[in-house]
Swiss-Prot record:
Signal peptide: none
One Pfam family in the UniProt entry: Proteasome
Name under which the protein is recorded: Proteasome subunit alpha
KW Transferase (keyword) present: no
Keywords, ordered alphabetically: Cytoplasm, Proteasome
Organism: Salinispora arenicola (strain CNS-205)
Pathway note: Protein degradation; proteasomal Pup-dependent pathway
């Protein structure tokens, strides 16, 4: 009869943690931070079809690193939960904290009960009336939840990126300055010999939760609008309304369709596909 090997619970948990950390470290990093106009998401993403940043509800956004199929399943479950609670009770009852707790319970159960943990790290962000009211929650593969102070980085080199963010981030920054700080932080790691990298616009996925919008606040920043934000000549200046949105009046209107709320680019009237 074959002898069965014994592994202590501590060793099993260490092995699962190591597996999850290695999987997360293989992916590209993402940054989430508060700025004067809302909450900014910036992720390195070479794919135009698979999004690492997305919308969950009116004032709640989602960003993740790791295995796409795993964190996308979590995001979809969060959308269904938020929609159900909003329809059953009130839209104001849907909060980022409640969603973060639900994600934490799911991740914790998978980590302890399944043979393989999810190789993901997640941020749930909720935009508030002011930067002090913004909420950023970090969730790790084992279900741990941390409330982050207005800025956070995810991925294998999150500690080094967070150090750059801590040095340069200010809550009163314009959108243009916030994008530059986020891209600078992402590019500070991964270069040859420890040198900084230059990240092109087509390698970035950028989105915001716009504090000034009513209803759905999530919108993507793409194309010419993103190029303007990354342009060195526009340093220290917020993007013009023609580049970032149709008009200030349009920004104050409630958004009812995914096309009007989800995409920002050179042709705002075109629905997001």
């Amino acid at each position: 009869m074959a002898m069965q090997f014994y592994a202590s619970p501590e060793q099993i948990m260490r092995d699962r943690s190591e597996l999850a950390r290695k999987g997360i470290a293989r992916g590209r990093s993402a940054v989430v931070l508060s700025y004067a106009g809302g909450v900014l998401f910036v992720a390195e993403n070479l794919s135009s079809a698979l999004h690492k940043v997305g919308e969950i509800y009116d004032r709640i956004g989602f960003a993740a690193v790791g295995r796409y199929n795993e964190f996308e399943n979590l995001r979809r479950a969060g959308v269904r939960m938020a929609d159900l609670n909003g329809l059953s009770y009130d839209r104001r009852d849907v909060t980022g904290r409640a969603l973060a707790n639900a994600f934490a319970q799911t991740l914790g159960a998978i980590f302890t009960e399944q043979s393989k943990p999810f190789e993901v790290e997640i941020c749930v962000a909720q935009v508030g009336a002011t930067t002090a009211d913004d909420e950023l929650y970090r969730l790790t593969y084992d279900g741990s939840v941390n409330d982050e102070p207005g800025r956070m980085a995810m991925g294998g080199q999150a500690e080094a990126i967070t150090g750059v963010l801590k040095s340069n981030h200010r809550p009163d920054m314009s959108l243009g300055d916030a994008v530059k700080v986020a891209v600078q932080a992402l590019g500070s790691v991964g270069g040859e010999g420890g040198a900084a990298r230059t990240i092109a616009a087509d390698q970035l996925e950028v989105a915001v939760l716009d504090r000034g919008r009513v209803g759905r606040t999530f919108r993507r920043v793409t194309g010419a609008a993103l190029t303007v934000l990354l342009d060195d000549g526009a340093a220290g200046q917020p993007p013009s309304s023609s580049d970032t949105d149709t008009s200030a009046a349009e920004a104050r209107k409630p958004t009812a369709s995914a096309g009007s709320a989800d995409l920002e680019g050179p042709e705002p009237e075109r629905p997001d596909s």
